[in-house]
Amino acid sequence: MSKEEFHVSEGCFITEWSNTSDDPAMSIARARVPPGITTRWHRLAQTTERYVILHGEGRVEVGDLEARTVGPGDVVLIPPACRQRITNIGKTDLVFLAICTPRFKNEAYEEL
């Protein structure tokens, strides 16, 4: 698996750390959102996602919950099929791990 960063249409940059059929229970990716950028509304079918914030400051929106500010050490739980997006509200890159269970598959992704 390539560990090179790539841009996704959602509006952020992704580096896949672990996403193989050898470990179908989970995938781990590093996500980077530049300052001032909001990712597109999207959801993952039959996949629970967790954001583990590593660096920067963001505002995360999950389903019908009130938007909340997140920073290093915060964990965001995103249930399956729940709409989500995140905004970088800081002056530096917002960096977080996106941990999916089961592992991320393109066919589970839907932009809204």
Segment roles from a protein language model:
Residues 16, 29-45:
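Conserved short histidine dyad/triad with adjacent acidic residue
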Residues 22, 80-106:
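Ligand-binding loop in jelly-roll beta-barrel domains
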Residues 1-26, 40, 108-112:
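A short, N-terminal "cap"/entry segment at the start of jelly-roll beta-barrel domains
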Residues 46-48, 52-58, 63:
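Glycine- and acidic-residue-biased ligand/ion/polar-headgroup-sensing regions
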Residues 37, 46-47, 66, 82-83, ...:
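A generic "binding-loop/recognition-motif" signal
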Residues 65-80:
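Short acidic-glycine-tyrosine-enriched beta hairpin
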